[in-house]
Each structure stands twice: as C-alpha cells, then as structure tokens.
Design a protein with these regions (language model features):
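Two-component/phosphorelay signaling modules centered on CheY-like receiver
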Residues: 40-59
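Alpha4 helix (beta4-alpha4-beta5 surface) of REC/receiver domains from two-component response regulators
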Residues: 47-48, 92, 106, 117-132, ...
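Short amphipathic alpha-helix used as the core "switch/output" element in two-component signaling
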Residues: 69, 91-105
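Receiver (REC) domain active-site loop signature in two-component systems and cognate sites
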Residues: 85
Length: 199
C-alpha cells in the first residue's frame, strides 16, 4: 500500500522536476552574458562552461575598460568579472557601474569570479554591490546555481548610505523552490568564514 501510494507522488515529482528544468533551461538560454577577464585562457574556460550549461549569447572583454564599454554598448543580463586586471580592476569596475544617474546600466547583476579570495576581498566585493562571489576554478554546477539564483530570485537594488547594490539576502528562495530549484550554498571561498559575509 505504502509503495503503491508513493508511486504517483514519485511520478508527479519527476514531472514537476522536468517542467522546472525546462523553465530553467529556457531562462539560461535567453540571457546575454559578458565575461570580463584579462586571461584569454580563463575566458575560454568560462565560455565553455557557459556553453555547456546552455548559455547562447556570450560576449568577452579583456580588461576593465573594455568591460565598461561592453556593458554600456549592449547591457548584458549578467557580468562575470575577474578582480585583478590591467587598466581597471574588477573592484573599480563595480564601483563605476554601481553609480545610478551616472552609469547607464547600474543594476546589471555581477558575479565576481576570482582566484583571489582573501577575506578583505569578499568584504569589499559585498560592500561594492557584487551579487555573487565565486572562487576560481569554478564548477559548471556552482556557476549554474548562481546564475539560476540571479534569474529566479532577483534581489531589489537598494541605496543604503553610500551603498548601491542588491538588497542583503533574507527570504528570497521561495520562487526557486516553486520551480524545483535548490538554493545555492555559500560561495566557494578559500577561507571558511568569508562566504558568510555575502549572505
């Protein structure tokens, strides 16, 4: 009895999971992503990950200044940004972008993807208004989880004193749960306490 009663639920769960996966797939396929990284090899690695998870519209910039111009030119749905770059580093780029009334696209979601994960960088990225902070090398699943979180649970942009960026996290997981998507875990950082600063 219990086994038979469980069968419809299992089937329904699989069907809901399939629908949810289709929705996520369509969302991911519809976005335009800008990769800003001075390392050509890393741009290729990130591009390959994005292609493998279904992203079709991908642009690249080799430094912060080129990244700013690209954001102005085509207003991507998401920016994946390195920290250490020539001419203009990632932190400086975020500071310029998060300037409503000055920069034309201040609300663009930003994922900081860097091999430099010292605690002060995580704190600084959070203060500057970065949406997510990930450590290189990143897995396809980790990157997909963050992208899905940004697409399905967009946090309102708020101004708090000198800060302009996504509202600090509270209860933003309900829309994801309705789609059958598990909320992402803490960012992949080298220091155990650093990830908590982004929550």
């Amino acid at each position: 009895m219990l086994g038979e009663a469980g069968k419809p639920a299992t089937g329904a769960s699989k069907a809901m999971s399939s629908v949810s996966n289709n929705r996520v797939e369509k969302l991911v396929q519809s976005i335009a992503v800008l990769i800003v990284d001075d390392n050509q090899y890393m741009r290729k690695v990130i591009r390959n990950i994005l292609v493998n998870i279904g992203v079709k519209n991908i642009h690249e910039a080799a430094d912060g200044i080129a990244g700013l111009e690209a954001i102005r030119m085509f207003a991507p749905d998401l920016v994946i940004l390195d920290w250490e770059m020539p001419l203009l580093n990632g932190a400086e780029l975020v500071r310029i972008v998060r300037s409503p009334g000055v920069f034309p696209v201040p609300d663009v979601p930003i994922i900081m993807l860097t091999g430099h994960v010292e605690r002060w960088r995580v704190i600084e990225a959070s203060r500057l208004g970065v949406n997510e902070f990930l450590k290189k090398p990143v897995s396809g699943k980790a990157l997909l989880d963050r992208i899905v979180a940004i697409l399905t649970c967009p946090r309102a942009m708020v101004r708090l004193g000198d800060y302009y960026g996504p509202e600090p996290r509270k209860l933003f997981y309900e829309p994801m749960q309705k789609m059958g998507v598990s909320p992402p875990t803490a960012p992949e950082t080298a220091e155990p306490g650093a990830a908590k600063l982004m929550v």
